[in-house]
Amino acid sequence: MKIIRTVLGDIPASEIGKTDSHDHLIRSGGPEVVRNPMFLMDDTAAAKREFGAFLASGGKTMVCMDPIGCGRNVGKMAEIAEAYRGQGNLVMVTGFHKAENYDPRVSFLATVDEKKIAALMCLEITDGMDLHSYNGPVVERTAYKAGLIKAGTSYRLITYLEQTAL
């Protein structure tokens, strides 16, 4: 059977409905927020209203494309998903953004080999995402699983760090 892996669990692919394939409801921090505070989206009540408006307009599934280390907040996204259980679906991602969002000297993309990065992404899909988005010093794996792998690249270029993630 073909499935869609949502934050709250797998559903038959036939239940996906109208889908917003790239959106952002919560961004609790990260490099983009450091560069431009207007990118901060950390208000769960506002995110619930936004998702509710999407559902009211005929949408069914929203894919939130905030990857590891870029302000992803698994706990808040799970709260939103629970608020709309049975009404709509949220899908979260594992993977990585463009290299400009990671330190080229000390980020795990720069210091960890490809096999370990691939294993980490597989765990996010099979076992659950880290509650803290690997901001350390511990990993606290949740029951909420990623449904897609994001592979962000620079414009007209794939950098060395991006190649590592790919």
Regions found by a protein language model. Give the residues of each.
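Active-site gating/metal-coordination segments in enzymes
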Residues: E79-E82, N89-L166
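N-terminal hydrophobic targeting/anchoring segments and the immediately downstream early-domain regions
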Residues: M1-S107
